[in-house]
Amino acid sequence: MGLLDLFKKKGSSDVAKDRLKLLLVSDRANCSPEVMEMIKNDIIKVISKYMEIDTDGLDIQITSTESDTNNGSVPAIFANIPIKDMRNSEK
C-alpha cells in the first residue's frame, strides 16, 4: 500500500466489501447488522471524546474466542482504531 492510497476515497466496491464484512461478523456473533452499527457508532462517540480517530480506517469485529473458564467459545470484540491525535486532557 502506497502513501497515496491513504488519501484515496473509498469506491463503491470498497463500501460493499465493508458492508459484507459487517454482515458476516454480525451473523457469527448472532446480532443484527443494525446492532453492530450502533455498537460501532457508540465506540466512535466515546473514543472521540479523548482522541481524534481515523473513522475510515476503523475496523471493529466480533469473533468467537475460547473462554478461560472452559465454558466453550464466547464472543469477543476486537477493534483496530487508528489514532490521529490525542485531545487535550484539560477539557
UniProtKB/Swiss-Prot annotation:
InterPro entries from the UniProt entry: MinE (IPR005527), MinE_sf (IPR036707)
Residue ranges of coiled coil: none
Pfam families assigned: MinE
GO BP field: cell division; regulation of division septum assembly
Keywords, ordered alphabetically: Cell cycle, Cell division
Function recorded in the entry: Prevents the cell division inhibition by proteins MinC and MinD at internal division sites while permitting inhibition at polar sites. This ensures cell division at the proper site by restricting the formation of a division septum at the midpoint of the long axis of the cell.
Similarity comment: Belongs to the MinE family.
HAMAP family, sorted: MinE
Protein name stated in the entry: Cell division topological specificity factor
Gene source species: Lachnospira eligens (strain ATCC 27750 / DSM 3376 / VPI C15-48 / C15-B4)
